[in-house]
Design a protein with these regions (language model features):
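Conserved active-site and cofactor/substrate-binding residues in soluble primary-metabolism enzymes
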Residues: 21, 25, 39, 43, ...
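Polybasic, low-complexity association/targeting segments
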Residues: 1-15
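Amphipathic alpha-helical segments within well-ordered protein domains
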Residues: 27-31, 45, 49, 65-66, ...
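Acidic, glycine-rich active-site loops and adjacent beta-strand->loop/helix elements
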Residues: 45-52, 71, 82, 87, ...
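Acidic-glycine-rich active-site phosphate/pyrophosphate-binding loop
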Residues: 27-45, 88-97
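Glycine/serine-rich anion-binding loops at beta->alpha junctions
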Residues: 48-70
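Short glycine/serine- and small hydrophobic-enriched flexible loop segments
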Residues: 28-32, 66-72, 121-125
Length: 131
C-alpha cells in the first residue's frame, strides 16, 4: 500500500473525532507533492466535500483535478481522469452518486471511502508518470 493511501485511510477514520471530507482526504496526503503545507491543503478542501456542499461535482473528483493541476499535469490527463470516473460511475454529481448508493443499500461512508481510496491510488500512479 502506498503512503498516500495509508494516510487517506487514516483520515477517513476521523482521527480524534475530526471529520475530513472527501476532498480534504485527498488534498492533505498529496500536499507535499503539490508544494503545499498540509494545513493549507486542508483549508483548500474545506468546502469541496458533499459536492461543494450542495450535491454538485464530487469532491473526490474536484480534489483530484486540483492535485493534477498543481502538479503540472496536462489537460489530457485531467480529461481522461474525468472521463474514466464518468464511465465507472455514470455521473460526476455527488447527489446522483449518493442516490445510486442508497439504491444498492451501501452506506454513504462506505461509498465515499471507496471513491476516495480508488482516486488516491489513481493519483499516486498519475503523479509518478512523466507526462
Amino acid at each position: 500500500m502506498n503512503h498516500h493511501l495509508e494516510e487517506t485511510k487514516l483520515l477517513r477514520q476521523e482521527p480524534g473525532g475530526r471529520h475530513y471530507n472527501c476532498a480534504q482526504s485527498l488534498l492533505v496526503p498529496f500536499a507535499a507533492e503539490i508544494g503545499m503545507e498540509k494545513e493549507a491543503a486542508d483549508a483548500l478542501g474545506a468546502f469541496f466535500g458533499a459536492g461543494m456542499m450542495h450535491g454538485s461535482a464530487c469532491g473526490t473528483l474536484t480534489a483530484a483535478l486540483m492535485i493534477l493541476g498543481k502538479a503540472g499535469k496536462d489537460k489530457e490527463t485531467a480529461k481522461k481522469l474525468v472521463d474514466d470516473f464518468l464511465a465507472a460511475h455514470g455521473t460526476t454529481d455527488c447527489r446522483c452518486l449518493l442516490a445510486a448508493t442508497e439504491e444498492k443499500g451501501v452506506t454513504r461512508k462506505e461509498n465515499c471511502d471507496g471513491l476516495v481510496f480508488d482516486m488516491c491510488q489513481k493519483l499516486a500512479t498519475l503523479l509518478t508518470e512523466t507526462k
